[in-house]
Design a protein with these regions (language model features):
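Bacterial N-terminal signal peptides
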Residues: 6-14
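Short, compositionally biased P/S/T/A/G/V-rich stretches that sit at domain boundaries
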Residues: 19-46, 124-171, 269-288
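Solvent-exposed N-terminal domain segments of exported/luminal and surface proteins
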Residues: 21-98
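Solvent-exposed loop/turn segments flanking beta-strands in beta-repeat/beta-sandwich domains
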Residues: 55-69, 169-200, 226-230, 242
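Recognizes extended acidic, P/S/T-rich segments that occur
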Residues: 66-94, 182-224
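Ligand-binding face of N-terminal immunoglobulin V-set domains in extracellular IgSF glycoproteins
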Residues: 92-110
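Beta-strand-rich modules
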Residues: 114, 221-244
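Extracellular fibronectin type III
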Residues: 120-122, 238-280
Length: 289
């Protein structure tokens, strides 16, 4: 795990208004690879992607907000409000080489104003955490269990809890700066893209997963019979920093998506056997893919 300390003096000296900021939980800029796991457990690449986000506290606000990338030539890209975060998404690419050409390693500068920070510029520096090769972690492979036994993704019993496990997060590790260890995210959405289960995010006063976790339980009450659900597991390597009392993450991440199907007979009007809306655009299949 690579770590970098940004603006040491800003950390050591009084932060003024920034020391009591109450608007932002964290900001993140990252590169990600997205994959789909087939019913036979084969994992295939879908696309490569760049993203940046500003996550808000429950009563937090940020306006305006934009991002300067290494190739921006001074032209900032505005963030869009998703309802729970300010988001900026780059293109989706068929190869990691294309991703790197459009979003190279370097400084990604968040420009934003919030009531508790005022107008600030926050730098998140993306740099390959490995000495050579791809900085992206291996794509996780998902394993499903019910009643202590492996279960196929097409035959999930909605009356039982579903235990989700994944292949080892080999690149994950603890943060020597003790800001945040490398993270894991598990999400399950229904056929309409509504999130029904989430493993949590840091700094939201709820449990969340790190590289050290090995499994996540989806409760039976979150499953309906005769339905299809969209399941994802993300492994995220972090490079942490802190400015203006706001934590910043530079991340290289890999996500695997898997559709799961519940058995049984649904109540009238509750069956849904096909995905009507993807909950995450990372599932996009590129033309020719």
């Amino acid at each position: 795990m690579k770590r970098t300390i940004f603006f040491l003096m800003a950390i050591l000296l009084p932060l003024g208004v920034g020391a009591a900021q109450t608007d932002i939980t964290f900001v993140v800029a990252g590169k990600t690879s997205n994959h789909r796991q087939q019913a036979d457990a084969e994992v295939q690449v879908l696309n490569y992607h760049f993203f940046a986000e500003i996550f808000l506290q429950p009563s937090g606000s940020v306006n305006p907000s934009s991002l300067l990338t290494p190739l921006a030539a001074g032209v900032a890209v505005p963030f869009a409000d998703s309802g729970y975060a300010m988001e900026m998404h780059g293109g989706r690419y068929a190869t990691e080489t294309e991703l790197e050409a459009n979003y190279p390693d370097g400084d990604y500068i968040f420009q934003y104003r919030s009531p508790s920070t005022g107008s600030v510029r926050q730098v998140v520096t993306l740099g390959n955490p490995k000495s050579a090769g791809s900085g992206l972690p291996r794509a996780p492979r998902l394993f499903l269990f019910q009643s202590g036994k492996p279960v196929a993704s097409e035959h999930i019993d909605p009356r039982q809890d579903l235990l989700v496990k994944w292949s080892e997060f080999q690149e994950g590790g603890a943060d020597p700066l003790e800001i945040m260890d490398d993270l894991l995210f598990v999400i399950m959405a229904d056929c309409d893209g509504v999130r029904r289960a989430h493993s949590g995010r840091p700094y939201e006063n709820t449990p969340y997963l790190t590289y050290a976790d090995k499994s996540f339980v989806i409760r039976a009450e979150q499953l309906l019979p005769e339905n299809i659900y969209q399941l994802s597991v993300e492994h995220a390597v972090l490079d942490t920093s802190r400015e203006h009392d706001v934590v910043g993450f530079a991340t290289f991440a890999s996500t695997t998506f898997l559709d799961i199907h519940t058995a049984g007979k649904a109540k009238p009007g509750e069956a849904c056997r096909t995905i009507r809306k993807k909950f995450d655009a990372g599932q996009t299949v590129l033309e020719g893919g």
